[in-house]
Amino acid sequence: MVTIRLARGGAKKRPFYQVVVTDSRNARDGRFIERVGFFNPIATGSAEGLRLDLDRVSHWVSQGATVSDRVAALIKEAQKAA
């Protein structure tokens, strides 16, 4: 099953997440099909905290991809900001 979820990057105690489309059987930070955005939970000041390609997200959802709970909340936030 294809899913849209977060893949963790960054350093110890400084997380940075890529929003990726991947097969649900792959490891969290493993192989992915497409990168559709990023999320920086500790962004401050003028740093960009969230960027999503909403067109690609809607494309994958229309193809049957499931969305994780956290990514669903981020999509809502991005749609509100757009």
From Swiss-Prot:
Q: Which organism is it from?
A: Edwardsiella ictaluri (strain 93-146)
GO annotation, cellular component aspect: cytoplasm; small ribosomal subunit
Q: What GO molecular function annotations does the UniProt record carry, in alphabetical order?
A: structural constituent of ribosome
- Give the protein name, as stated in the record: Small ribosomal subunit protein bS16
Q: Which family does it belong to?
A: Belongs to the bacterial ribosomal protein bS16 family.
Q: Which domain of life is it from?
A: Bacteria
The GO annotation for biological process reads:
translation
- Which lineage ranks, top first, belong to the organism behind this chain? Bacteria, Pseudomonadati, Pseudomonadota, Gammaproteobacteria, Enterobacterales
Q: What keywords tag this UniProt record?
A: Ribonucleoprotein, Ribosomal protein
